[in-house]
A protein has these predicted regions:
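A non-transmembrane, solvent-exposed segment enriched in polar/low-complexity residues
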Residues: 6-151
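Amphipathic alpha-helical repeat scaffolds of TPR domains
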Residues: 159-172
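Sec-dependent bacterial lipoprotein signal peptides
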Residues: 1-4
């Protein structure tokens, strides 16, 4: 009797780089310090591709070699990963695998709340004490929602590398 495993350890990164230039180099590195180069890809007609195998899920980052702030963090795991690299300030995106979809969902939520925070904090119109207090309560509420979003994602993923990454890298604020 012979058994074969249907679980593949192959990954494919399908990269989309419509804002980047033909011939640009994309670096794929381990996210930890010091960063370790795992591979490179060349942008051709707005796309790039990287394939390989991995027996563990790794937290990585892809970035444009000439502009490191054009980057995307992602989990390198078996399957097809879609990576959209965009020039700042447009955020890059990742999807395609279960953990990367959850990572992007977390990033989207934090980005939405962060945009609200910035909008509130940058409003310079004079206001009375009650309006000011209300604004501060809204800012505090957004901070708490952001923290809860991160902590809930960590709890839902406690048994996998996404949850472990959040646990190791996120320090929850101490609210009054």
């Amino acid at each position: 009797m012979m058994f074969c495993s249907c679980q593949s350890d192959r990954y494919q990164i399908d990269g989309f780089a419509r804002q980047l230039e033909q011939g640009d180099t994309i670096c794929i590195v381990l996210e930890n310090e010091p960063e370790r180069l795992l591979g490179t890809a060349i942008v051709h007609q707005g796309k790039f591709s990287v394939t390989g195998t991995t027996d563990t899920i790794l937290f990585c980052r892809a970035y444009l070699s000439r502009m490191k702030d054009c980057n995307a963090s992602f989990l390198l795991e078996p399957g097809t990963i879609a990576l959209e690299l965009n020039l700042p300030p447009k955020p890059s995106r990742v999807s395609g695998t279960r953990l990367n979809n959850q990572w992007q969902q977390l990033n989207d939520s934090i980005q939405r709340m962060g945009t609200e925070l910035i909008k509130l904090a940058s409003t310079k119109t004079p206001c009375d004490e009650a309006t000011h207090r209300s604004k501060l309560q809204t800012i505090d509420s957004l901070h708490r929602r952001m923290s809860a979003c991160i902590e809930n994602t960590a709890k839902r993923n406690a048994d996998n590398p996404l949850g472990q990454y959040i646990k190791e890298n996120y320090k929850a604020p101490e609210f009054e």
